[in-house]
């Protein structure tokens, strides 16, 4: 029922919101019919540093790093910053994780605006009944230390090329808007 939208174009109409973004296109011959092209999934993109970021594209790249089992990428709000910063959640063997190699991998494979600012190491990624990765709860919990106390959260500070554990002091710097993202 939450995916059914009412009164979109006229009173009483009902539409099923699939989350797909499509556009009409001219194929050169239409025979009086409209043609549509799939563009993207709504909610699977976010804006950061005035650029559109596809969560699926970033996840596909991060999944090629040998120590990332499955990446779930989403955008999160940062105080005093426009748009949403990239964040990724994945599970891995944290003791053996090669942070320097991962940081270099991210810098080489992704443009700066698409590089995750935050990383959350989690026990297990949740999926829907159709095996899509769940993002809503992760997006809401984001990097907030009071909501993710059991997980390890890392941050890439502005101007730096490595991920470091997010501690309470730097969390406060982020929350008061003076981190400079």
Indicate residue ranges for each PLM-predicted region.
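Short, charge- and proline-biased low-complexity linear segments
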Residues: 20, 147-152
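Long, low-complexity intrinsically disordered regulatory regions
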Residues: 178-181
